[in-house]
């Protein structure tokens, strides 16, 4: 590690002076030293490299860094330090594909060049001006890298800068993505590991319908995408729908999930419901009538395009929000700290999260309380429909709160549901900004809110969600590489060698062994998860009588029921109801949907707590929080050494371990209390080892405690001045 300051030695820039020159480093370490290369993955090749390059650290105001080699491959930007790694603990949670100083090309968000102390955004791969003295890379996982290029030869510095800018920023075709080079050099048999229900076969859908007791029809007519290229090969629809080829795959109500009362959740792609087109309204009536006839319940529809922000609004809001976490240095951090809360509020990102959770609660209320079918729609039916349907199922179905269940849910609603991951994540750096939007990240944000509010209800941890959000930008997994099932099939067939009988098969992100070993995967599990023991049948909370599902449709008019929720008249009455577009307008009271949902939440809160039953989020202002692990893990100034959630979790695990020990003692004294065969494994076999919390930072397991030099910060305001004075006083107390 080198310390750079304002001394008097010569350097390439008068304002930047090194106490140790690169020449001295070469003499000290190895006169014959060559550029270092990382361990390359199968199919990975090096495009360009430069040495020596100084990588800055962000620990404090003094310009510190470490020398090494900077490379650009067809998979990543990599920095190989000349110093030996100092932290043994870094092996505890290590990604097999890339290290802490590696950036997958898809993960690069923006590149800046520093010219004469002025930062300039680089928008293309061709650098017309002179090579900058410094390169700053902002990553989509919120990391910030700063490289000084002045110590290497000018031609090497320009080559590495142009190479990185070209391969990270220039528009490219999908066949240039590293996944295909990786697949051709990897044994396909090693990539077949089933960690989730893939919903790519009729058997998977049949199993899911059986699990939820759904009475629908499995569609196999699109197996070769003859019906529609925007629909999955297999999907489920109401049984009452006729010939699907008449609809050309448009506006079909696709089944998502069935409630135990018999009502169900559907989603569909519809243009805006404000249209007065007669054909459109007739088609809409046909679809909703089919949903209603399937279960003999009324249907409530919701056009998400009207009630939730647009994709462009989501993109703009997140762009503002993430800027407050891309910190270049300590000075920038303290300047942003002065207006931290007002800046976050002005971005509107947390409000969008709240709106999505609110809409999901409204859907849950219709299914759980009103016992009505719900049909959510939007223009494509593959963006916000995926968000709301997935959130509603997590709140209603405890299976989706397990690791296997959650991964199966993402596979069903997002991957098989044809969410356009390639376009929304902008993996190919397309210039069309209208199709870019972090919709899947928005979903993960909403799930994190549920996890942090109801931790014992979830088998997976926030670390799992953070890693999943990072994995979106790793160009290997088929889960996030394509826009639809048809897109995936056509691309994989085209890229397969002619001599190969079957098409190439990408690994899915659910095969976590590709990225992490078994010890690291233990961090994906929540140690506070309240598992439901099979032999102890928990008595469900008493609930009001649910309507019994009728398995056949009467040939005459609908029978008028005594309870609200059934059809009261024939189709004419139904068509009048279909003109209503919003769930909020279907509410029985004149109150707003927010007020109605608030009453629903308060009613749920008064019931006995059941982590394996209905789960609702609190939407009050303080309850919707910032995902601290994801957004603050790379900012050293906010890390708490030996504190934060890691310290709390360590203490809780110590207590849980003592409980396990007491259970074993009781079982030894009374064999009748012995663990049943179907009981989950002992706690210490399934929990990660946190070690001593005093050695860890609050951002563990992504970063660890480091030896840092703390220096007083020049205050920028009265409050900061008081804080600095208080910190200095505390430091004096500690040293005295």
UniProtKB/Swiss-Prot annotation:
Keywords associated with the record: Cytoplasm, Sarcoplasmic reticulum
Region listing for Disordered, in residue ranges: 672-691
Localization (cell): Cytoplasm; Sarcoplasmic reticulum; Cytoplasm, Myofibril, Sarcomere
CDD domains according to UniProt: PH-GRAM_MTMR12
Cytoplasm listed as a keyword: yes
One GO term of the biological process aspect: locomotory behavior
Pfam families in the cross-refs: 3-PAP, Myotub-related
Quaternary structure note: Heterodimer with lipid phosphatase mtm1. In skeletal muscles, the interaction stabilizes both mtmr12 and mtm1 protein levels.
Functional description taken from the UniProt entry: Acts as an adapter for the myotubularin phosphatase mtm1 to regulate mtm1 protein stability and possibly its intracellular location. By stabilizing mtm1 protein levels, required for skeletal muscle maintenance but not for myogenesis. In skeletal muscle cells, does not regulate mtm1 subcellular localization.
Protein name: Myotubularin-related protein 12
């Amino acid at each position: 590690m080198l310390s750079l300051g304002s001394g008097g030695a010569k350097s390439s820039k008068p304002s930047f002076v090194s106490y140790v020159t690169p020449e001295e480093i070469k003499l000290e370490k190895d006169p014959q030293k060559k550029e270092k290369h990382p361990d390359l993955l199968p199919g990975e090749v090096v495009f360009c490299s430069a040495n020596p390059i100084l990588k800055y650290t962000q620990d404090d105001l003094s310009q510190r860094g470490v020398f090494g080699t900077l490379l650009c491959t067809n998979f990543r930007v990599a920095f190989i330090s000349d110093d030996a790694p100092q932290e043994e603990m870094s092996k505890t949670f290590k990604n097999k594909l890339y290290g802490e100083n590696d950036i997958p090309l898809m993960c690069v968000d923006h590149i800046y060049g520093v010219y004469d102390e002025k930062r300039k955004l680089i928008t293309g791969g061709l650098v017309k001006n002179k090579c900058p003295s410094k390169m700053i890379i902002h990553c989509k996982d919120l990391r910030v890298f700063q490289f000084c290029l002045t110590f290497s030869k000018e031609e090497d510095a320009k080559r590495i800068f142009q190479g990185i800018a070209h391969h990270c920023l220039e528009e490219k075709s999908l066949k240039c993505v590293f996944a295909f080079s990786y697949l051709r050099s990897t044994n396909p048999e090693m990539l077949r590991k089933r960690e989730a229900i893939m919903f790519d076969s009729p058997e998977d859908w049949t199993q899911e319908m059986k699990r939820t007791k759904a009475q629908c029809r499995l569609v196999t007519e699109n197996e070769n995408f003859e019906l529609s290229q925007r629909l999955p090969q297999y999907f489920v629809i109401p049984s009452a729908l006729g010939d699907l080829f008449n609809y050309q795959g448009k506006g079909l109500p696709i089944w998502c999930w069935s409630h135990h009362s018999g009502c169900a959740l559907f989603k569909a792609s519809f243009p805006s419901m404000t249209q007065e087109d007669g054909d459109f309204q007739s088609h809409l009536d046909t679809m909703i009538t089919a949903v209603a006839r399937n279960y003999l319940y009324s249907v409530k529809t919701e056009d998400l395009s009207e009630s939730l922000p647009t994709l462009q609004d989501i993109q703009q809001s997140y762009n503002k929000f993430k800027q407050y976490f891309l910190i270049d240095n300590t000075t920038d951090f303290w300047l942003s700290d002065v207006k931290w809360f007002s800046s976050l509020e002005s971005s509107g990102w947390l409000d969008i999260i709240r709106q999505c959770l609110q809409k999901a609660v409204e859907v849950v209320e219709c299914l759980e309380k009103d016992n009505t079918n719900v049909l959510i729609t939007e223009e494509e039916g593959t963006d916000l429909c995926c968000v709301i349907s997935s959130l509603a199922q997590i709140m209603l179905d405890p299976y989706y709160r397990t690791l296997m269940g959650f991964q199966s849910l993402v596979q069903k609603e997002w991957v098989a549901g044809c969410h356009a991951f390639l376009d929304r994540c902008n993996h190919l750096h397309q210039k069309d900004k209208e199709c870019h939007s972090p919709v899947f990240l928005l979903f993960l944000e909403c799930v994190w809110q549920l996890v942090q509010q109801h931790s014992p209800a979830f088998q997976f941890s926030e670390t799992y969600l953070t890693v999943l959000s990072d994995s979106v930008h790793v160009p290997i997994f088929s889960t996030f590489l394509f826009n639809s099932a048809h897109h995936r099939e056509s691309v994989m067939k085209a890229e397969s060698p002619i001599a190969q009988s079957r098409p190439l098969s990408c690994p899915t992100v659910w095969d976590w062994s590709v990225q992490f070993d078994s010890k690291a995967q233990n961090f994906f599990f929540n140690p506070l998860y309240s598992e439901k023991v099979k032999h102890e049948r928990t008595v469900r909370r008493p609930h009001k009588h649910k309507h019994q599902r009728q398995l056949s449709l009467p040939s005459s008019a609908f029978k008028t029921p005594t309870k609200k929720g059934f059809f009261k008249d024939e189709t004419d009455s139904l068509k009048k109801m279909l003109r209503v577009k919003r769930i909020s307008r279907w509410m029985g009271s004149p109150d707003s949907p927010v007020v109605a949902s608030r009453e629903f939440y308060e009613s749920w809160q008064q019931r006995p707590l059941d982590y394996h039953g209905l789960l609702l989020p609190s939407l009050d202002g303080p309850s919707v929080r910032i995902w601290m692990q994801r957004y603050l893990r790379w900012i050293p100034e906010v890390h708490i050494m030996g504190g934060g959630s890691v310290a709390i979790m360590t203490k809780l695990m110590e207590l849980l371990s003592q409980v396990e020990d007491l259970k074993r003692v009781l079982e030894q004294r009374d064999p009748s209390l012995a663990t049943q065969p179907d009981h989950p494994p002992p706690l210490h076999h399934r929990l990660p080892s946190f070690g001593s919390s005093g050695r860890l930072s609050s951002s563990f397991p992504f970063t660890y405690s480091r030896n840092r030099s703390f220096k007083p910060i020049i205050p920028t305001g009265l409050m900061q001045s008081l804080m600095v004075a208080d910190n200095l006083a505390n430091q004096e107390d500690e040293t005295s």
